[in-house]
């Protein structure tokens, strides 16, 4: 089950063809839709409608289950057209958005006083190994990474998404963020699909982590969804900014 299939534009179009069907009628027509797919026959209009409504109801049901079980949403978004530079740092280090994601996950675990696992969707073994290498370097070779390993178990688990329901739920949430969640004041202002924003945006807002973080000696509000305009740009701390300001020569006046 993929979010891109469950909530594609056709499903919304089919669901809106007729009034909402009673549960039993919808189930009957959904079975007809799936059976005709196996038989290579064309479904009739009520079957398309039932299948579309069933897909949307399933997505809503997943979000309801996540809320009932106190799930918390974490996501790091980057612009679609970002290209990875050909540099040693890009090859060997975690991207900035990945570090920010771990940061927020750490704040949540620290708040809950619980250890947390990293469960990944297995994609391609060579790329997965490269990611593990970057992750190990972060947790072993950086002071921040070693500190955060107090709550984050620094060894990820890889699973097949088609056999793991939580990964499928995460995929649905990611798809809804991609198309229906924006942070315009922070530069995350790409066009949305209105039907996703209106139907599932409130679920994302409810599930998003909210807590407190700390950096450079200060405490600030932290949220589970973060937008990173350039995931390969070097991060500059407040201390470094202050040192840079002090090192500048005074401006001469005329």
What are these model-derived regions, one by one?
Residues 1-254:
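Phosphate-ester processing/binding pockets and catalytic centers
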């Amino acid at each position: 089950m993929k979010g891109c299939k469950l909530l594609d534009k056709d499903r919304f179009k089919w669901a809106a063809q007729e009034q909402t069907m009673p549960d039993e009628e919808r189930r009957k027509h959904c079975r007809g839709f799936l059976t005709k797919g196996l038989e290579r026959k064309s479904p009739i209009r009520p079957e398309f409608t039932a299948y579309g409504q069933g897909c949307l109801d399933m997505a809503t049901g997943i979000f309801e289950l996540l809320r009932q079980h106190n799930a918390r949403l974490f996501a790091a978004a980057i612009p679609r057209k970002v290209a990875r530079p050909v540099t040693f740092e890009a090859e060997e280090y975690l991207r900035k958005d990945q570090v920010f994601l771990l940061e927020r996950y750490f704040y949540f675990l620290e708040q809950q006083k619980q250890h947390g696992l990293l469960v990944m969707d297995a994609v391609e073994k060579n790329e997965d190994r490269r990611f593990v290498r970057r992750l190990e370097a972060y947790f072993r070779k950086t002071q921040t990474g070693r500190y955060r390993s107090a709550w984050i178990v620094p060894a990820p688990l890889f699973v097949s998404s088609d056999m793991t329901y939580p990964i499928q739920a995460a995929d649905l949430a990611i798809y809804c963020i991609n198309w229906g969640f924006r942070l315009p004041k922070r530069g995350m202002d790409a066009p949305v699909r209105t039907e996703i924003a209106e139907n599932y945006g409130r679920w994302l807002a409810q599930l998003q982590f909210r807590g407190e973080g700390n950096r450079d000696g200060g405490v600030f509000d932290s949220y589970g969804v973060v937008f990173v305009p350039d995931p390969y740009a070097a991060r500059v701390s407040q201390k470094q900014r202050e040192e840079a300001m002090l090192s500048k020569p005074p401006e001469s006046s005329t």
